[in-house]
């Protein structure tokens, strides 16, 4: 029992580092997609930011083979679109070219999905369009996702009334009732 308590701060510190890295990579992917795929001109500050981030990610580690990733390691909870529903999983590894998610079942290579991740501590949610680049069967399965589209980073809040409201603004809230 004592051993698990000592390990807890290390795990939360590691997860904090992963979230910071994800935040940086989402900004890199956003600028890269806007510049390369969408043809949207970047202003001077954004061009400098993209070049700086490119230097950072180019110097980072290469993606590890799926066989070397420990699926029992604690990850960050995520959701993936799969067929007509959602698939829960955990983000296990993260590089600028790939995200590795452990899930109950694999997704076919080439399948396009959207990964959703929310950080309750900072109040930030990420929506990342991806394509399945590789997968490994097992329990749990490991799915390698390649970023494929414009990611979205946004803040979320809980209404002060504590009641959820339709995103279309339809219906009454607890205050109006």
Q: What are these language model-derived features?
A:
Residues 95, 132-136, 149-151:
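A generic structural motif
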Residues 118-123:
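Short, charged beta-turn/beta-strand-edge "cap" motif at the junction between a beta-strand
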Residues 89, 126-135:
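Short beta-strand-centered aromatic/proline hotspots
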Residues 1-94, 160-177:
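N-terminal helix initiation/capping motif
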Residues 107, 140-161:
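Short solvent-exposed strand/turn elements
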Residues 72-117, 139-145:
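Short strand-loop-strand
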Residues 91, 132-133, 144-147, 176:
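A structural signal for short, hydrophobic beta-strand segments that form beta-sheets
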């Amino acid at each position: 029992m004592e051993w698990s308590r000592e390990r807890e701060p290390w795990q939360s510190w590691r997860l904090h580092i992963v979230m910071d890295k994800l935040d940086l990579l989402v900004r890199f992917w956003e600028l890269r997609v806007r510049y390369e795929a969408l043809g949207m001109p970047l202003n001077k500050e954004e061009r400098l930011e993209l070049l700086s981030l490119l230097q950072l990610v180019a110097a980072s580690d290469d993606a590890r083979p799926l066989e070397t990733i420990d699926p029992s390691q604690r990850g960050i909870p995520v959701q993936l679109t799969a067929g007509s529903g959602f698939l829960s999983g955990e983000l296990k590894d993260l590089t600028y070219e790939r995200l590795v998610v452990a899930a109950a079942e694999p997704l076919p290579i080439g399948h396009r999905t959207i990964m959703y991740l929310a950080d309750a501590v900072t109040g930030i949610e990420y929506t990342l369009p991806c394509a399945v680049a590789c997968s490994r069967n097992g329990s749990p399965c490991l799915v390698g996702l390649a970023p494929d589209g414009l990611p979205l980073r946004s803040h979320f809040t809980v209404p002060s009334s504590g009641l959820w409201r339709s995103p279309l603004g339809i219906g009454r809230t607890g205050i109006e009732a």
